[in-house]
Amino acid sequence: MRKTLIPAIGLSLMAAALQVHAAGLSSEHGVFDKLADGTAVEKYTLRNSQGMQATVITYGATLQSLLVPDKHGKAEDVVLGFDDLDGYQKGTAFFGATIGRFGNRLADGKFSLDGKSYQVPLNDKTNALHGGPKGFDKQIWKAEEVKDKGSVGVKLTYVSVDGEMGFPGTLKTEVTYSLNDKNELRIQYHATTDKPTVLNLTNHSYFNLAGAGNGDILDQVAVVHASRYTPVNEKLIPTGELAAVAGTPMDFLKPVAFGKRIREDNTQLKFAEPTQGGY
């Protein structure tokens, strides 16, 4: 029996409306870098008529760059990334990567499914983090350009065989990045498995709306439309509780600067920053 899962993430960034007509939607691809064995890592660049530009590479189905113009028309790269493959291969921060099979941490690298216990490799002290030491972020994905009437995009595909990193089932995963003229970058996931498995896909981009390298984000303001969050323990493992954000540093229901929340006195902040857990 095949099982299909289709989550999606939408990202909308407001930028200056430059005087360029709708025909400005375009895409191109080339070589980003090469592996030691000579395998090419491709890059796909998506552009719209507003001056926004997203670059995705096939290593880890990674969002490598996202140029967004400000109200004066000056474009800044608002996500953190590397200019060559070496940084992604040696790095441990998962910059911009597609995370799988299982995002976040599995305590002791263990889980049970349908009465059977599974052990996956540890890569975060006593935890398995973001799919293990060779998760989706370390794989070369196949890519193809996709276009429709209102957007331009790239679809990346990876097949994880049964038992890879200890996870059951052969899993075919597709990640599609698309950009439209409303300055919306959309990430859509589609996965099919041939037997029951666990799956928690996400994108691991780090944002600085002032532009990469332009200071910290403590004065930047965020809104998260969620009334509950998932507390974690000292090992950053979710406790299973769905706690109310009201009265905690995790409350971003109304616009608030990150710096204000980070400086609050709360037990959760002894373990991680306010947005380390889930909402």
Protein language model regions, located:
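Positively charged, low-complexity intrinsically disordered regions
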Residues: 3, 20-22
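Bacterial N-terminal signal peptides that target proteins for export
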Residues: 1-8
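Bacterial N-terminal signal peptides
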Residues: 8-19
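An exposed, glycine/acidic-rich loop-and-rim segment of catalytic or binding clefts
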Residues: 23-52, 58-279
